[in-house]
Amino acid sequence: MKWLPATAVFAAVLPALTAFGDPASVEISTSHTGSGDPTSDAALTGFTQSSTETDGTTYTIVGDITFSTFTNIPVPVVTPDANDSSSNSSKGGSSSSGATSLIRSSNLHSDFDFTKDSVLDLYHLFFPSASNTLNPALLSSSSSGGSSSSSSSSSSGSASAVVAADPKGGAAFYSNEANGTLTFTTDSGNPGSLTLQNLKMTGDGAAIYSKGPLVFTGLKNLTFTGNESQKSGGAAYTEGALTTQAIVEAVTFTGNTSAGQGGAIYVKEATLFNALDSLKFEKNTSGQAGGGIYTESTLTISNITKSIEFISNKASVPAPAPEPTSPAPSSLINSTTIDTSTLQTRAASATPAVAPVAAVTPTPISTQETAGNGGAIYAKQGISISTFKDLTFKSNSASVDATLTVDSSTIGESGGAIFAADSIQIQQCTGTTLFSGNTANKSGGGIYAVGQVTLEDIANLKMTNNTCKGEGGAIYTKKALTINNGAILTTFSGNTSTDNGGAIFAVGGITLSDLVEVRFSKNKTGNYSAPITKAASNTAPVVSSSTTAASPAVPAAAAAPVTNAAKGGALYSTEGLTVSGITSILSFENNECQNQGGGAYVTKTFQCSDSHRLQFTSNKAADEGGGLYCGDDVTLTNLTGKTLFQENSSEKHGGGLSLASGKSLTMTSLESFCLNANTAKENGGGANVPENIVLTFTYTPTPNEPAPVQQPVYGEALVTGNTATKSGGGIYTKNAAFSNLSSVTFDQNTSSENGGALLTQKAADKTDCSFTYITNVNITNNTATGNGGGIAGGKAHFDRIDNLTVQSNQAKKGGGVYLEDALILEKVITGSVSQNTATESGGGIYAKDIQLQALPGSFTITDNKVETSLTTSTNLYGGGIYSSGAVTLTNISGTFGITGNSVINTATSQDADIQGGGIYATTSLSINQCNTPILFSNNSAATKKTSTTKQIAGGAIFSAAVTIENNSQPIIFLNNSAKSEATTAATAGNKDSCGGAIAANSVTLTNNPEITFKGNYAETGGAIGCIDLTNGSPPRKVSIADNGSVLFQDNSALNRGGAIYGETIDISRTGATFIGNSSKHDGSAICCSTALTLAPNSQLIFENNKVTETTATTKASINNLGAAIYGNNETSDITISLSAENGSIFFKNNLCTATNKYCSIAGNVKFTAIEASAGKAISFYDAVNVSTKETNAQELKLNEKATSTGTILFSGELHENKSYIPQKVTFAHGNLILGKNAELSVVSFTQSPGTTITMGPGSVLSNHSKEAGGIAINNVIIDFSEIVPTKDNATVAPPTLKLVSRTNADSKDKIDITGTVTLLDPNGNLYQNSYLGEDRDITLFNIDNSASGAVTATNVTLQGNLGAKKGYLGTWNLDPNSSGSKIILKWTFDKYLRWPYIPRDNHFYINSIWGAQNSLVTVKQGILGNMLNNARFEDPAFNNFWASAIGSFLRKEVSRNSDSFTYHGRGYTAAVDAKPRQEFILGAAFSQVFGHAESEYHLDNYKHKGSGHSTQASLYAGNIFYFPAIRSRPILFQGVATYGYMQHDTTTYYPSIEEKNMANWDSIAWLFDLRFSVDLKEPQPHSTARLTFYTEAEYTRIRQEKFTELDYDPRSFSACSYGNLAIPTGFSVDGALAWREIILYNKVSAAYLPVILRNNPKATYEVLSTKEKGNVVNVLPTRNAARAEVSSQIYLGSYWTLYGTYTIDASMNTLVQMANGGIRFVF
């Protein structure tokens, strides 16, 4: 503001001018300058402007007026320096020798009035050398007013201070009228300036003294500089109000000094600076309070156009001067009436130079008015600074000399820049408000307020480098602090305090609201030069000493040590902290404290809401809460940006933040919550939250907004790189709950105890760690020296997580997760627990009970490990999962895999149990109701030792009980292993590893569709191994029941049980396959020690299993036989029950590779049942070679049940099969087959009536050497096909019945043949053997009677294939004279009869080409008619998808060259095309046609039916072009190329001979079609009709592959091919009809269809039986035909079209009909 209108000036000063009548008016147009010498200045009569008007005086300043260089301070008396006798005097002006001692008093004001004489008397009493005469202008009839201070001046050296007898101020202007207002104004048209400088007075107000109000208005400049008062008000003093307003340019107070209050001004009532251009207080000094301004009332500064500056002002209480020994009191002084403080002060100043001086103990300071408060401003009431541009408080200080004691009852505690005994309000700043470099002796380095502090509407607030020796380096308030509505920046930087609150201390609450950018940086609290005595972490919050009751001062020497209370490096609140509406950032950075709360300390609740970027970074605390400490709950709501705690550190708990015991952190709707790189020397590297930490998002729709279909998620949590020396590297809490978030990440956190990322605490029946409804949860790269590399807690629940990753964490137990109680994982769409490491148990997860349920997506537990190099016997469990209770996998619907996990001891010397490479479950593991494949792959339990006395077990799973049941998708165990470095089976005292995939006390696999064990390895039980974990109860049992199929493939064992090892094994109602398994010793598929039951409900196959060693050494050397199943019991037989009641059982190619022996079952075995029901079989293609521990042979009934009418097969057709079953066998039901070269040895064999025994060539049925026993058979089927010699091979091997040699003959050794012998011709060609062209003796049985037993063949009846309708005919009879070594059949030849001749036609095989060609043309017609022909090329360039149904019918009537032939087909076409340009179309189609053909009877003896199914792929295109000379008529080109693959099958029936032929063959076909058309008549505006001429070339080529008939007298046909080129030429007419929004587009065409090129397909055939050959020629259609076509399209709006075409081709004897219909969609 340069100039103000006159009306504005008048309005501003009107209240002061009209308060008490009309004041006197004085114009001042002359400057005044004194000499600076008190004697000379006393003689000046016109210098001081005195007002005696009761209504005051108005001074009009004309021009630039200056009052300068005036003093009434006596020249001090200089005495010789005691240390320098040569010094006689001291020269120079007046100066202070030290601050006056202040007396403890509540009232320093005196009502005693001096008369002139009394003043002179008192003056001469203390100054005997002074003149007897004083200038009246320097004397007052009364004391100088209400100053509560006394002062002195002094000189340097040994000069004594001199004080005037009557202190007086007002060197320039003086008014003693209480109601008289001194007003300073000017001419508004030519404003003047007033400068008061270098005025030094003994009384109050060196330049101006007024008992009434004081008003400055309308001046150009107002300047007070270099003025000094030995009392209060270094420049001006008023006991009324001070009003300074409408100053055009500047108001300046610089270098003013007072020994009392108000270094520049002292105001008893309200102080107002208003409507100024600028206001400046600089280098003003007060000896008591208010270095710049002191007011007993309020201070208001408002409407400052430019700047407000308070720079280098001081309120400094000096050390007292030594108190001299007083002389005897003068009779002139009445001690009862003179102000005590005045006398003491003056006496101290006026002591004669020769008087001795005695040191005095400093007097305590007892009032806030004298305690050095307010380095720039002191106000006993409120302060308001508002509506300004810039405000600066810089380098102001409030101090008390260190030798002085501030009474503990004193309210005042400094305020380096501002002190207010009430509230402070600074508001409406458009520029910058700066508090910088201010210092306070105690609290409030910048601001000290007894009341509330409000900083509002400040564009830039900067509080930097303020310091105090108490609390609140920048701000101290005994009530609340509010900072709100900041437009740009609020910053607290570099502030320090020694106690609490490096920047801010508030006894009340702190509110930060509606600010843009708030930063607290590099603030510090604490005494860093003294040792730290930390308070205990659980002590009550420190409260300011000023809030406690007053107590007597305690001498410093006697004071007890004080616990360091330096809390809150930047901020301290004894109530709460409330933050809201921060739009850019609230940052606490690089702050530090020596106790709790390196960034902030909040005693009660901390609430932050609706803000952006709350951040605590790089703060330090010597106790808890490196970033934040809160004594109550913390609530964060609706925060955007990163809510960040980063690189903070604490010496105790909570590197980032810490809360008091029992308190919680609740966060709702945060965009990002980050704990990063914080450290704590105890718990909670990132955060220590003793009760609950909750982070969630709550979505509330607006009133008009519909509820969301799916609850939205929002926000993230990032806990990364934090470190705790104890537990909870990221977070330490009792309960943690995260929900409704987009992501939660715990990464690279470290703890030296438990919970590398997160530690929660177990609570009874309560989940203490939960993650619910979150998109991504990542727990990665965390480390704990103790347990829980990622998470440690009691009970955890992960629910409705889209993506869960637990990866690369490390710990002693629970590398990823460690829980003392349960873990529940459910509804996790995608999950991964991978690459985690533990040194004892639970590489991925460690918990008591674990439930993985309702997982709809992909979930993997992969590459986790428990790995260590053991030096002590510490058991290692659970590479992927460890459970001290039960593990349950249920209702999993996505893909699930436990892969690549391991538990391993890398040491080679120390033994330990190593179990559960994938999962270790102490009590049970259950996998049930899963409808996704479950994969266990490449898991391992291993030791580097070559032998071990401990148990290595369970490469994938280890548990007492494993149950896998009621799943609907495959369960797969692939390449898992339990192993040591052993190369041979364990010796006595050592243990084999067990269970490459599963090791358990009991295993139950039931009601699953498919289970696969492939490539697993262990030393026993390559896939499944049973271990006694319960001392035999329940028994070690494997139960596999009610499954669809179970596959054991390529599993291996070093010892036995390549697939399964157990005591009791039951495979029932399950299809199972054991293929390619191996072991070193017998039992390559199954090794069983008690009982084995095999009762499948579909096929049970043992195939290609291998034993690799020749012998196995236990107590004795045992030869390996290559047994797939081995009974491993050295004391008794194991029992085996084979039941094929619902599915067949096969043993095939099970081999001992070292000896090339094949064996299905071996060991000490007793068969309790071998049962096969009707249609089922038990097939032994490998030998059964069992032994027994029983003394007497046991009974065995084959097919004992009446329903067991199936087949039991022993076959030697693949390799030698000598089966030994040392039991007494009764064959009760069904069919027993001894296949080619198979041998069965039993103790005895008895065939029950109604059964059949089929014996193949070379088969042997023998008794056994264990006991004597006979063979009794009564219904035998003999495969005769290979026991009748041929002309080329006379050597044959009939079946053999054998009695083994015995030392002592026994009558039980006998052979008895009765009943029926059925001769079987399985290939139907026995009677084509020319060997039967004469009488022959054919051996029916060879008899090997080494036991010399009885052999009888009585009542034997022959049946079966005893003759044929064709071939060699004769009769068979049993030779009654057969010798003891053979049973002979005699053949008597009768005649030879040929096949009956049936004439057969062949052309219908070739006629199928017609059906193939017709399917190609039908598809082509659909493409042309539906898309290429009807979709006009002037249409817009849209894309189309279309689909149509196809139908065709071909009928060939009988003619002289062929029989009738019909073909009908149906199918579909699906196509998509595009128009890159309007005139060009390109598309592709896929078609399938399912056709059937039929020929009628011929010669009444055969009928032919067939089918031809085609699959076709087509490309089609169309384009418009013009002939070069004719541009008026476009030519439309259309082309189709189709490839087809056809499959044909036929059946020809010959009823007369009850025979048939069947044939199957393939054809490959191509079609190429090119059409050109031109419009002869185009549509007109009045007609949509169009006439078009078109011609096309249609070429088809079909190649039929060769094939051979089956069944009756088969023929072999060669391949052939057919090509056909037709040139359809014709006309078409089309037009459109419209009805409402529907357009109907119709078209009719007719064409002549000549065939101009074709070939006649020919094939050759050969009759296989007679080698007769011939040719087959196709009957060709006629060359000329006609084609008619009708099509229609219905346009249903812009996108959908219905269409259809019907085409008919007619020629002589042939009619072909083709139809297409479908729908088209434009996109």
Swiss-Prot record:
Coiled coil: none annotated. Residues 85-100, 140-161 have a biased composition (Low complexity). One of its GO terms (biological process) is double-strand break repair via homologous recombination. It is found in: Secreted, Cell wall; Cell outer membrane. The keyword Calcium does not apply. The keyword Transmembrane applies. Residues 1434-1723 form the Autotransporter domain. GO terms for cellular component: cell outer membrane; extracellular region. Residues 78-100, 139-161 are annotated as: Disordered. It is a peripheral membrane protein. Belongs to the PMP outer membrane protein family. This is Probable outer membrane protein pmp20. It comes from Chlamydia pneumoniae (Chlamydophila pneumoniae).
